[in-house]
Curated annotation (Swiss-Prot):
Belongs to the NadD family. GO terms for molecular function: ATP binding; nicotinate-nucleotide adenylyltransferase activity. Catalyzes the reversible adenylation of nicotinate mononucleotide (NaMN) to nicotinic acid adenine dinucleotide (NaAD). Pathway: Cofactor biosynthesis; NAD(+) biosynthesis; deamido-NAD(+) from nicotinate D-ribonucleotide: step 1/1. GO terms for biological process: NAD biosynthetic process. PANTHER family: NICOTINATE-NUCLEOTIDE ADENYLYLTRANSFERASE-RELATED, PHOSPHOPANTETHEINE ADENYLYLTRANSFERASE. Keywords: ATP-binding, NAD, Nucleotide-binding, Nucleotidyltransferase, Pyridine nucleotide biosynthesis, Transferase. This is Probable nicotinate-nucleotide adenylyltransferase. InterPro entries: Cyt_trans-like (IPR004821), NadD/NMNAT (IPR005248), Rossmann-like_a/b/a_fold (IPR014729). It is an enzyme of class 2 (transferase). It comes from the Bacteria.
Amino acid sequence: MKKIGLFGGTFDPIHNGHLHIARAFADEIGLDAVVFLPAGGPYHKDAASASAADRLAMVELATAEDARFAVSDCDIVREGATYTFDTVQIFRQQFPSAQLWWLMGSDSLMKLHTWKKWQMLVRETNIAVAMRQGDSLHQTPRELHAWLGKSLQDGSVRILSAPMHNVSSTEIRRNLASQGVSDGIPPAAARYIREHGLYEK
């Protein structure tokens, strides 16, 4: 059975922390592919934010060297609000017999019970969780306790041993705006940023 991982995010810009956790996701779950899903709308209020087309281009460039990585624009081309459940449904229709895995940070796990159709979502996809520094499963809201306990036991939720890297896209954008450079960006994406004058003041 094919295993497909789904990794949504703003990727504004994509950075080495994203690639690190995507590789850990693929390795630990044994995925055939990890599909990066750049979000559509303008999620940042500051002006130094890249367009959906630029973010998509940067993700495509940054992921090109790993054959397991793919990129989808499905969250960009959909009009209006995009919800994880709807995104997963698109992939379920495309790959009806595949085992789907959704990657989320532990901060998202703590709020999962507030997501649209979350109980239907977790029936359609397995969940891989990357723990952020300082987070613990003991902090999980009681609304999720029964589901999480059962899912950890049956393997439909996996906690990755690799933690979420403490890299901030906000800080990267700030450094690019003030200094024109920032550590932690894949070289191909950094070149694109320079060539297109992204994140300048």
